[in-house]
């Protein structure tokens, strides 16, 4: 649907407001940006063409903490209601309920609030994905209740996105596979960061401030974050749990090594090789993974309750401990804050990783 929409935009020259869960593939963010078809974008992106259009002022961009984006959409604070929700699915039940694929994001809230729902049934996604989701949308004030999760493997919702047949106006078959990005090789700097961090965790356990299997881990996205989490494979730590936003290759490594008992997230974002490995071993991985709406996966309430260990990457940080995760040279948007603010401000232990310099040593990552 987004690719067909981009082709129409190039001919008819109109624009839309685009709300997503987080970043999307080039088939959406890239195609629509190149067609000059986006007026407003929120809450996170990683596409080069989208980023360039945002930084040049062609696209208005709202950089949000990801835990807040769904509720702000429901409240109507982002410029009105949702007209059309496009959701990828591997199946639709007879009752109209939607079985998501490898990402939950904000889909449940968008389906709930949209006037029209379009479902893309992706035939490249395995039916074994059914049952891997736990869909729970919190009530809005004044009726909001605590989100009843006290450990990563708790299930509190449904394995589908609730919907009704009358709301689904179009069903579009799709055979485009997930196009994920390659992760960088684990270099010596990343390996050393991981070793230093694991040494710190051992000291915390020895001091009695953490249990032997630690507290639930949260890991950001990207090559450095993936390298750090992969370092746990060679440690003597075991029976680990994860409560995070995005699940990458390193967590598959931990499951394969018997070190990770359970991982909760909102999306899978592995490398192409990691995605192939997931599909090949999905019957085993589904025992250890649950995907939730990002309003729950990124919930500051839950992060603080279960006491996560937050591990994220930084563009730069200052000597007072302030961290910049969003802007280059103070004014150019990179991707966005994403979920790092949700987790870092509410974790039991907060850690940011960065190499000491950027641009081949020309720019310091540590600033006054």
Segments the model singles out, each with a brief description of its role:
Residues 1-368:
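Conserved alpha/beta enzyme-core scaffold
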